[in-house]
Regions:
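Glyoxalase I/VOC metalloenzyme domain signal
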Residues: 1-5, 11-30, 46-185, 189-257
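Membrane-anchoring hydrophobic segments
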Residues: 36-38
Length: 257
């Protein structure tokens, strides 16, 4: 079963510039280190155990899953779920029709030299970014997640992830199979969209589809295809700040109401 959102992935052109901009927004940004596949990252950790991964490339890496998506622009591009049984949930997703790889080993070397190791099951093809990728730590999870959870802007965790989709029946089947419960129907007049919302641990994941051709989601689907669209954050104080969208590098982030 999914335990909650592990992290959201924001792909950017220049890691140092993006990390600096997120610091200007009041986030405590920690250097994550390098992956051996040509990418490096910076992390924004929250007290609920989730985090934002800001990722870029320090060398050309055309086989990387986020290399081609970055060519269409910086943005929120993918999401990872914690699971209490990686092999079982990978198998369940595959039985539901999700194109997902068997668990494979990944690693990252932190700036202090510590090598982190984990297993990932990666949704691929048209399911990338719609179905989550799944993670199981081989080294202690607390070594992977920074302990710097205090942010000047009051951010305390992920609230709701919104994923734009062209139809709902498949994701409804996936999540009901994994979670064993029905979603809540949702509608958003501003987005001119409707969808389904699943509670996953402390987080919400909503899949939204446009109901008019003028919906912002319709344009998103034309440009990027089904994929993460936006996310809200939880705040530790009553009057959360408004983010300067120019500093978010294409990621639609806001504090939930």
């Amino acid at each position: 079963m999914f335990k909650g959102i592990d992290h959201l992935v924001i792909v950017v052109d220049d890691l140092d510039r993006a990390a600096g901009d997120y610091r200007r927004l009041g986030f405590n940004v920690v250097s994550g280190g390098k992956h051996p596949v040509g990418s490096h990252n910076a992390l924004v950790a929250f007290e609920d155990g989730s985090y934002l991964e800001i990722i870029a490339f320090y060398q050309e890496s055309p086989d990387h899953r986020w290399w081609d998506p970055l060519k269409k622009g910086e943005r929120l591009v993918d999401y990872c779920m914690q699971t209490d049984d990686l092999a079982r949930d990978t198998g369940k997703l595959r039985e539901c029709g999700v194109t997902i790889n068997d668990p494979v080993p990944w690693s990252r070397i932190r700036p202090d030299g510590y090598e982190l190791e984990w297993l990932l099951s990666l949704a691929t093809g048209s399911h990338r970014g719609v179905a989550p990728f799944l993670i199981q730590d081989m080294t202690p999870r607390e070594e992977r997640i920074p302990r710097q959870w205090q942010h000047e802007n009051g951010a305390a965790g992920i609230g709701t992830l919104t994923v734009a989709v062209s139809e709902l029946s498949k994701v409804d089947h996936w999540y009901q199979t994994i979670m064993g419960k029905e979603p809540q129907p949702v509608a958003d007049d501003a987005l001119e969209a409707q969808g389904l919302c699943f509670a996953v641990g402390p987080h919400q994941v909503e899949f939204m589809t446009p109901v008019t051709p003028h919906s912002p989601l319709a344009d998103w689907l034309r440009r990027f295809g089904p994929s993460p669209y936006a996310a809200t954050l939880r705040a530790t104080r009553g009057e959360p700040v408004l983010f300067d969208q120019k500093l978010l590098h294409g990621a639609d982030l806001s504090f939930g109401i």
